Swiss-Prot record:
Listed GO biological process terms: cytoplasmic translation
Keywords, alphabetical: Ribonucleoprotein, Ribosomal protein, RNA-binding, rRNA-binding
GO CC annotation terms, alphabetical: cytosolic large ribosomal subunit
Domain of life per record: Bacteria
SUPFAM superfamilies: Ribosomal protein L6
PROSITE patterns linked: RIBOSOMAL_L6_1 (PS00525)
Name recorded for this polypeptide: Large ribosomal subunit protein uL6
The family this protein is said to belong to: Belongs to the universal ribosomal protein uL6 family.
Assembly: Part of the 50S ribosomal subunit.
N-terminal signal peptide: none
GO MF term list: rRNA binding; structural constituent of ribosome
Length: 178
């Protein structure tokens, strides 16, 4: 059984949390995030510690309790440190370019793919085959990185495509000739 909901969230220095009728706003050095949570979960702020309490031990309450705690912790970490996902491109002629806030990808198609950065997301290119997606919302960073990867996900025969750094791609044997 998971006990994530019972863990205490410690607010780092410079991070403020405001709770107005379970609409929580977290402000930090990197920005501000707001999210509405279930009215069933009580959010208590005592100094620099946040604790979450559920009214009963039903299965639904336990799931909401753990999820709320994880989302709230991600908000606190996001506004203080931020999140980033790194992607790498493998394939002949595969490269990325930045045009303002737009990411332009050449991934073996007849046309370049263009990805507009959502609000709060920045793209960085340490080299033409590495893409770093960063921002304060873990959810939006993950969705944006997954979308970029989906434009040319790694194929199992040669391994060409866009993958997360450190991702293992299962390879297949090709057809055997006569």
């Amino acid at each position: 059984m998971s006990r994530i909901g019972n863990k205490v969230i410690v607010l780092p220095a410079g991070v403020e949390l405001a709770n107005n009728d379970n609409v929580v706003t977290v402000k930090g050095s990197k920005g501000e995030l707001t999210r509405e949570f279930s009215k069933d979960i009580e959010i208590r702020v005592e100094g620099t510690e946040i604790t979450l309490h559920r009214p009963n031990d039903s299965k639904e309450m336990k799931t909401i309790h753990g999820t709320t705690r994880a989302l709230l912790n991600n908000m606190v970490v996001g506004v203080s440190e931020g999140f980033k996902k790194e992607l790498e491109m493998r394939g002949v002629g595969y490269r990325a370019q930045l045009q303002g806030s737009k990411l332009v990808l050449a991934v073996g198609k007849s046309h370049p793919d263009e990805v507009e950065a959502p609000e709060g997301i920045t793209f960085e290119l340490p080299n033409p085959t590495t893409i770093v997606v960063s921002g304060i919302s873990k959810e939006v960073v993950g969705q944006t990185a997954a979308y970029v990867r989906s434009l040319r996900s790694p194929e199992p025969y040669k391994g060409k495509g866009i993958r997360y750094v450190g991702e293992f791609v299962r390879r297949k044997e090709g057809k055997t000739g006569k």
